[in-house]
């Protein structure tokens, strides 16, 4: 059994030479030449390739759809993703939308994946991955990288910025992913892939995996035909800390006269939805939700009082929360948007703030190494039932009036539109709200049990909802997605309505055409907030091109809206439906007017004295 090293003069093999500037070597000076018997003894089965191992891992964790844009560096890898049973490759129109789709998919499935090519694709998807990072979503971003032989050669490659050092893409991803794997050899590829995926799931953040374009089809002994199930060690609370934390929080809350609860967006990453509901059931406290956490707590619960969003909260919600003498916040994020320009009337000394792995009572003490679900479940057993705050809420509560019906041929108003959208919701639907006035109008929708709800508040990237609708609908095929998108946002990412059609999706898109960037107008107006009007239904019809199932309608009155809704929920219930809603450019929610003025004031603060 003889193995010869190529290029070793002792073996009688000439050292390979380069053909000249910009040329490949005649042979690989590091190649191993093995006899057939040796190869049979040392190599893995032909099916145990790097590409197949990665594909199987994605299926194993639930990312059975990968949103991709092909490029020459990832084509071979895409072949292996396509070949994997149980995995579907969804081709997108651009990398940004592929990333947004992986974001939306992760919101439903718990993890998403996208695949792009080196640098030109990677830097294009970067914005979407940054959004997933800010929203605590595990997204596996796979990049087809350069040939492994090109690392360290001082060569200039295409699809780069023209420097011999082509690590710029990696450096960009280092700040917006929790782990980066550069796979340019087979020996540690198995470990790097598994570590990256495990880290994404454990940290609930995106990861970056670059796979050299010449490795996807190669076998290695570590890529077994049936991969060993990946084990992610569970996090556990420190038992002593947990006991002390529960005791401190229970004592604090049990002394309060009218305590309340508020759910925040980090309930998702903590996987604490059921634990939060258990505290609400046991305590008798009224509970609200921060805007970015809508959909994470049960709105059908009898003591749910709405969205707490400072000055733009659900009617009577802020009064109850801010007048409480103690409040339990689970997983909050207090930024300038969620605090309405830092104008919340809350006091730290009254708050128990629980984060995914720590909590603090008032101004102290603070406790680390405790997990939110374990803490909340233990706390539920220690709280005395107290319905005082909820009783106060019931005394002052007056139901909101429905907007009056429009007169015949009267131009449609936005509040009338959302009155009818509310009537469409069920446990078999999900709402995706785009950045803009839809944030505020969709917050008013009372979600039935089982109804999903998603929007991107922390990052707030306009255009996100088109890709997110694609991804969410692909992941949750048992739900019909209702997307509310402004015209300005739609112009950013409209192309992937095409991909929705290719995938046979049946979402309903309400395109709100008011002629500009309404949310920006209310923060700071200017001519840059006016956009060129499109024939949006005509555009979608052109994309449809008689391929797939699609139905469009343009509505200007309430009568037309009723007709459209009857059609999309009846005869066209199995179609992708696109309804362009024409409204006045100044028709906005009162909440946006208030929020915009306060955020504008926060943005306009003068520099501090030096």
From Swiss-Prot:
Its cofactor is a metal cation; thiamine diphosphate. Its EC number is 4.1.1.1. It comes from Zea mays (Maize). Residues 437-519 are annotated as: Thiamine pyrophosphate binding. InterPro entries: DHS-like_NAD/FAD-binding_dom (IPR029035), PDC/IPDC-like (IPR012110), THDP-binding (IPR029061), Thiamin_PyroP_enz_cen_dom (IPR012000), Thiamin_PyroP_enz_TPP-bd_dom (IPR012001), TPP_enzyme_TPP-bd (IPR011766), TPP_PDC_IPDC (IPR047214), TPP_PYR_PDC_IPDC-like (IPR047213). This is Pyruvate decarboxylase 1. It comes from the Eukaryota. It catalyses: a 2-oxocarboxylate + H(+) = an aldehyde + CO2.
């Amino acid at each position: 059994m003889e193995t010869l090293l190529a290029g070793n003069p002792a073996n009688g093999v000439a050292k390979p030479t380069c053909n000249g500037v910009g040329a490949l070597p005649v042979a690989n000076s590091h190649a191993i030449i093995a006899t057939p018997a040796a190869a049979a003894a040392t190599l893995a089965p032909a099916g145990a390739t790097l590409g197949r191992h990665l594909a199987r891992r994605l299926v194993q964790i639930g990312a059975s759809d990968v949103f991709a844009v092909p490029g020459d560096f990832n084509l071979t890898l895409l072949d292996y993703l396509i070949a994997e049973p149980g995995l579907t490759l969804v081709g997108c129109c651009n990398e940004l939308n592929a990333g947004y789709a992986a974001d939306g998919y992760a919101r439903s499935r718990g993890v998403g994946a996208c695949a792009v090519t080196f640098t030109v694709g990677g830097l294009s998807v970067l914005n979407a991955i940054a959004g997933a990072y800010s929203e605590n979503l595990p997204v596996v971003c796979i990049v087809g990288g350069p040939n492994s032989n090109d690392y360290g050669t001082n060569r200039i490659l295409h699809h780069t910025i023209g420097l011999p050092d082509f690590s710029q893409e990696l450096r960009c991803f280092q700040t917006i992913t929790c782990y980066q794997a550069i796979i340019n050899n087979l020996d540690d590829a198995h470990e790097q892939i598994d570590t990256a995926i495990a880290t994404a799931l454990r940290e609930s953040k995106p990861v970056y995996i670059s796979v050299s374009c010449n490795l996807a089809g190669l076998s290695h002994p570590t890529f077994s035909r049936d991969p060993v199930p990946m084990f992610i060690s569970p996090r556990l609370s420190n038992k002593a800390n947990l006991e002390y934390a529960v005791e401190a929080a229970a004592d604090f809350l049990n002394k309060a006269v009218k305590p309340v609860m508020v759910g925040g967006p980090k309930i998702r990453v903590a996987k604490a939805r059921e634990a939060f509901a258990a505290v609400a059931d046991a305590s008798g406290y009224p509970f609200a939700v921060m805007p970015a956490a809508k959909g994470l707590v049960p709105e059908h619960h009898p003591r749910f009082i709405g969205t707490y969003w400072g000055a733009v909260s659900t009617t009577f919600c802020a009064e109850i929360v801010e007048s409480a003498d103690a409040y339990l916040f689970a997983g909050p994020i207090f930024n300038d948007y969620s605090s309405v320009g830092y104008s919340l009337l809350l006091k730290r000394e009254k708050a128990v703030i629980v984060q995914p792995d720590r909590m603090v009572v008032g101004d102290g003490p603070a406790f680390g190494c405790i997990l939110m679900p374990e803490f909340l479940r233990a706390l539920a057993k220690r709280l005395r039932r107290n319905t005082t705050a909820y009783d106060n809420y019931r005394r002052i509560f007056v139901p909101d009036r429905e907007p009056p019906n429009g007169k015949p041929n009267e131009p449609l108003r936005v509040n009338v539109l959302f009155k009818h959208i509310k009537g469409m919701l069920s446990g078999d639907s999900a709402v995706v709200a785009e950045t803009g006035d839809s944030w505020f109008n969709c917050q008013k929708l009372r979600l039935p049990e089982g109804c999903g709800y998603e929007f991107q508040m922390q990052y707030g990237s306009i255009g996100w909802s088109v890709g997110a609708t694609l991804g969410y609908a692909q992941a949750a095929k048992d739900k019909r997605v209702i997307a509310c998108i402004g015209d300005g946002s739609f112009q950013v990412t409209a192309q992937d309505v095409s991909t929705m059609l290719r995938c046979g999706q049946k979402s309903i898109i309400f395109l709100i055409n008011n002629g500009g960037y309404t949310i920006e107008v209310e923060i700071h107006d200017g001519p840059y907030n006016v956009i060129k009007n499109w024939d949006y239904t005509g555009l979608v019809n052109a994309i449809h091109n008689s391929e797939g199932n699609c139905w469009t309608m343009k509505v200007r009155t309430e009568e037309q809206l009723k007709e459209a809704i009857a059609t999309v929920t009846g005869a066209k219930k199995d179609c992708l439906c696109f309804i362009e809603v024409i409204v006045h450019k100044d028709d906005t929610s009162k909440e946006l007017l208030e929020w915009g003025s306060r955020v504008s004031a926060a943005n306009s603060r003068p520099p501090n004295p030096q």
